[in-house]
Amino acid sequence: PPYKKLTKEKELLSVYKAEAYNTDTNNIFSFFIEKSMRIGKVVSLIVPKSLINAPEFNKTRQLMSKKRVSHIIDFGEKGFKKVKIETINFVVETQRKSAQTIVESYITEKVVVQQQSYLMDTKFPYWIIYRNEDFDKVADKMEFNVFKAYRDRVITKSLTKGKGQVRVLKSRNIGDNQIIDIPEYDSYVDNLDGLDVSKFLNKTNCVLLPNLTYNPRACFLPKGCIADGSVAILTLANNDEVITKEDLSFYATDKFTKFYAIARNLGTRSLNIDNNSVFFFGKLKG
């Protein structure tokens, strides 16, 4: 199906949404999946890999999980030549209940058979198609769903400068429980007017995590600083929760890094930390 968000065609979008279960997305391919499942016994489509994990497709995954998803092929970026988009293929048997799912990966060059219920376990916010024993060992030691995620969408280079009143932290400034100073990279602003991110200024219980990386590391937000969109700002989902530097240092370990790669389904493009993926930045139990 076409991969396109309908933004200007309001009337057409309302027609599509009138029949859709998932009205949280404007992307046509989601409507194609639903209609195909209504009229077909066996449905197989190549769609963006974001179907697996993005919050806007939560309801689409719910629908699919109730049927038998017999195959998932992860093409990574190899689906279409010269097109830098990650894609997957799935086969859904709409008149059969879940059983086993065959996962074929162009990334790992392996074929693995797992119980569908294991890969689509509802205790996680989305499907984990590379889930394995190593992933489970780390997951069993962690308490999840500790944070909410925020990302600035306003601050650009044109708004920042080399010196100023308030420091604007960017992804490379974030180290393991430390802020890294980088000459000619560090940024500042003088005026926070109109910047929504200013609400976090001097709130020291906020946690900073770089976006778009398989090299996770975290630190607390220092006073006198904010962060641009290359950094996720995490706040506690429950204010009674206590997060320590030891909790944050776990994110920089090899064990968590490998766990996190599986949690992100070995994706390469859509690695922004959203309110689904932030789930996995938990804290160690006890």
Regions found by a protein language model. Name each.
Residues P1-N145:
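Signature of N6-adenine DNA methyltransferases within the class I
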